[in-house]
Amino acid sequence: GFLDSFKNAMIGVAKSAGKTALNTLACKIDKTC
């Protein structure tokens, strides 16, 4: 239902945000960007 799709959307946003944060962190650490 609505709550399931909302939860899935939140998980998707959290995953992409986490991935972006990890990439930024890795970039700062080993200067690969």
From Swiss-Prot:
Purpose of the protein: Has antibacterial activity against the Gram-positive bacterium S.aureus ATCC 25923 and the Gram-negative bacterium E.coli ATCC 25726.
Tissue and organ expression note: Expressed by the skin glands.
Subcellular location: Secreted
One of the record's GO cellular component terms: extracellular region
Top-level taxon of origin: Eukaryota
Membrane-spanning intervals of the chain: none
Biological source species: Pulchrana picturata
Protein keywords: Amphibian defense peptide, Antibiotic, Antimicrobial, Disulfide bond, Secreted
Lineage: Eukaryota, Metazoa, Chordata, Craniata, Vertebrata
Disulphide-bonded residues: C27-C33
GO biological process, one term: defense response to bacterium
Main localisation: secreted
Presence of keyword Transmembrane: no
Family that this chain belongs to: Belongs to the frog skin active peptide (FSAP) family. Brevinin subfamily.
Name under which the protein is recorded: Brevinin-2PTd
Pfam families with a match to the protein in the record: Antimicrobial_2
